[in-house]
Each structure stands twice: as C-alpha cells, then as structure tokens.
Amino acid sequence: MSHVVEFTLEVKPGHYQDVVDLYSQFAHDYMAIDPHLISVHIVGEPGTGLVRGIGVFDSQEAAQEVNSDVIFATFNDAIEPLISAPPNRVILDLLHAWSR
C-alpha cells in the first residue's frame, strides 16, 4: 500500500514565495534521489501563508525514512526562519487515487 506524507507550513508574512521556491526545489531534488517517492504536489494559499507538500511513497517505511535524510534536515534548516509555527507532518494511507 502506498503512503502519503503531508507536510504543512505556516509561512511568516512576506516569505510565501521564498518558502514555495525552497519547497519546490527540495521536492524536485528529493524526487531525483528517492526511488520510493512516486509523486509530489506542492500546494498553497498565499492569502493565509499556508504551504503544503503532499508526497506519495510506495511504502510506509519509505515515508518514515524521509525524516532521517540529510536533504530533509537541510530543507528544514532553510525554512525555519521563514515559518511562524513548527511544521506539521503526518503520514496517511493512500486509500484511492485517480488521475488523468
């Protein structure tokens, strides 16, 4: 069963695009090095400063291991001064997926 990592950030005013750019680069780079990462979506709402990454992994173990990767720690260090609250990370079962 695939698993989804949802990683949500509350961005400080004036830093929305900075966080979007950092998140997009991290997702691109991580997708290139992790064969277990199936897809990534970065979504956001500029008005509220919410930025959320949704990554689909081929196993729960792969989804959990992201926290141990140096590239993830580097990303967290880069966004830390730009966010107003600690990131919220959850791992969910992927129940159904449709795409065209």
For every predicted segment, state its role.
Residues P13-H15, E61, L95:
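Residues that cap or initiate secondary-structure elements
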Residues Q25-I38, V56-V90:
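An amphipathic, aromatic/His-enriched active-site/gating alpha helix that lines ligand/cofactor pockets
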Residues E10-Y23:
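Short, surface-exposed ligand-recognition loops at beta-strand->loop->(often short) alpha-helix junctions
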Residues E10, I54-V56:
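Short hydrophobic/aromatic beta-strand micro-patches
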